[in-house]
A protein has these predicted regions:
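Conserved alpha-helical scaffold flanking the Walker A/P-loop in AAA+ ATPase domains
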Residues: 12-18, 81-102, 109-110, 114-121
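Conserved beta-strand scaffold positions in the cores of enzyme catalytic domains, especially
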Residues: 69-71, 152
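Residues immediately C-terminal
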Residues: 78, 110, 125, 141, ...
Length: 301
């Protein structure tokens, strides 16, 4: 992860601010990787305090034991009103060891409007030497009044090649390539795929859905996979299979004609959009398979 982050424009801008002495009082880091958000905020903190992971101060930052660096919320918790009040109170106190303090918040997009409002005044006019980095997977839930008080840095999804290289650095696995292609540019998603046995189940489900050619089988397949936990990842794996069939002519979807494969990819994009609107997944799968099968039969006639 460190190697990936240090190549990003967001990280380079932040480093430039630190080195030029023009550091903003508050940053908002948009980064879609919830799994790795805390680790990335710590990398930014190392740069803020001008230290490295191999140095004593760097070790304390990474272990969250340096009193002038506070990372919220606790692992697995949600940033709430009590934590916001604690930050407001703590920010008014002088740094314990150095000349500045850094507050980092992971998953800020999950904070309610009430909680975000509690920080507005402190974000706008923090005490001297106090700085903030707010990490959010999405900017949409963040209040405009908060966004107007911070400098926004964005880390876009990584390329498939970058994800694969990062996975290979973590360890060789026969799942690395497929995980990199199915993760939509999010390393944490790919890491979870490789680490969990569920990814093989997901691959099998995608293969079965993409291979269906009989309308009579669709209902049973939709019921079988309609409750799958990793819905977005399933659609991404299906997309990978269709694209592979379109370019190489093989795989689970290889029996479909090129027009049918293009149509399937278009319908997948529609399905992904409907999923974001909380569409019932079993029905979504059923309609998708039915549309593809019917289109395939029409083009064959």
């Amino acid at each position: 992860m460190e190697q990936l982050i240090k190549t990003t424009t967001a990280y380079k801008i932040f480093c430039g601010d630190i080195r030029s002495g023009k550091v903003s009082h508050a940053y908002m880091l948009r980064f879609e990787d919830a799994k790795n958000m805390r680790a990335v905020l710590k990398l930014f903190a190392l740069e803020f305090f001008k230290t490295g992971e191999g140095q004593p101060l760097g070790h304390r930052i990474l272990s969250e034991s340096y009193p002038d660096f506070r990372l919220y919320p606790q692992e697995g918790k949600k940033f709430n009103a009590d934590a916001a009040a604690e930050i407001v109170e703590d920010s008014a106190m002088r740094p314990v060891e150095g000349s500045k303090k850094l507050f980092a918040i992971s998953g800020f997009e999950q904070a309610s409007a009430l909680v975000q409002n509690k920080l507005l005044k402190t974000l706008e006019e923090p005490p001297e030497g106090v700085h903030f980095i707010l990490g959010a997977c999405s900017l949409a839930p963040v209040l405009d009044t908060v966004k107007s008080r911070v400098k926004i840095l964005e880390i876009p999804p990584f390329s498939c090649g970058q994800i694969l290289a990062a996975l290979e650095r973590n360890g060789k696995s026969p799942l690395n390539s497929a995980a990199a292609e199915s993760a939509n540019g999010i390393l944490g998603v790919a890491e979870n795929m490789v680490a969990g046995g569920w990814f093989q189940q997901l691959k099998d489900a995608a293969a079965e859905i993409c291979a269906v050619s009989d309308a009579g089988e669709i209902g049973a397949i939709a019921v079988k996979h309609g409750d799958i936990k990793y819905k977005e990842e399933l659609l991404a794996e299906m997309q990978r299979l269709y694209f592979t069939a379109l370019t190489d002519g093989g795989g689970a979807a290889g029996k479909l004609s090129k027009p049918a494969l293009v149509y399937a990819l278009e319908k997948l994009n529609e399905a992904a959009a409907q999923l974001k609107l909380n569409a019932y997944f079993q029905a979504l799968l059923y309609e998708f398979m039915l549309d593809v099968v019917n289109f395939s039969h029409r083009t064959e006639e």
